């Protein structure tokens, strides 16, 4: 989904410029991993979450990515957590060569379908907003869904990370 969101953003940007008669312009897309996706009960699982998020954002066309340290939900991350956050990007960049392909997901049926569906839904929301009917967020959508490391598949023993200050 992350990958399709970023692809959709670029398509929507181009459409918005076209509809408004503006000249085509590049979209500079800077993203950051989400604090909300960080589990506080099993912080080490956040390393995997960050890796998946960076991978999706990179394949989706993000220009720059900031990775929050895995222990951010507990407090001020220590040097190790900050180092891991930097290394997530460095490893994906240097070892997977994500940067070598402009749109690696192009032609993948499911990704193309998901990107198109996101574009259509976002454009409808945008049109409604422009007509003064601002869409309201649906906070009930994710209620009850399990979160790995928080409400499902908890580690048998907690291994708290080192932090420099409490949150």
Residue ranges and their predicted role:
Residues 1-57, 68-89:
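Helix-rich catalytic cores of soluble enzyme domains
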Residues 34-37, 62, 70-72, 153-159, ...:
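Short, glycine-/Ser/Thr-/acidic-enriched flexible segments
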Residues 61-72, 98-105:
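Short acidic/histidine-rich active-site segments
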Residues 83-167:
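Catalytic-core signal marking the mid-to-C-terminal active-site face
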């Amino acid at each position: 989904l992350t990958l399709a969101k970023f692809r959709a953003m670029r398509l929507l940007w181009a459409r918005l410029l076209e509809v408004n008669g503006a000249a085509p312009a590049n979209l500079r897309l800077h993203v950051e991993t989400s604090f909300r996706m960080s589990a506080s009960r099993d912080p080490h699982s956040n390393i995997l979450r960050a890796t998946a998020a960076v991978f999706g954002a990179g394949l989706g066309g993000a220009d720059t990515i900031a990775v929050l340290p895995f222990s951010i939900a507990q407090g001020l991350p220590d040097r190790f957590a900050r180092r891991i956050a930097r290394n997530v990007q460095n490893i994906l960049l240097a070892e997977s060569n994500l940067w070598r392909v402009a749109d690696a997901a192009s032609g993948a049926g499911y990704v193309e379908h998901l990107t198109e569906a996101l574009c259509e839904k976002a454009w409808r929301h945008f049109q409604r907003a422009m007509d003064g009917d601002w869409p309201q967020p649906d906070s009930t959508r994710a209620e009850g869904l399990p979160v790995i490391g928080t409400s499902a598949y908890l580690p048998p023993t907690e291994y708290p990370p080192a932090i420099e200050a409490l949150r």
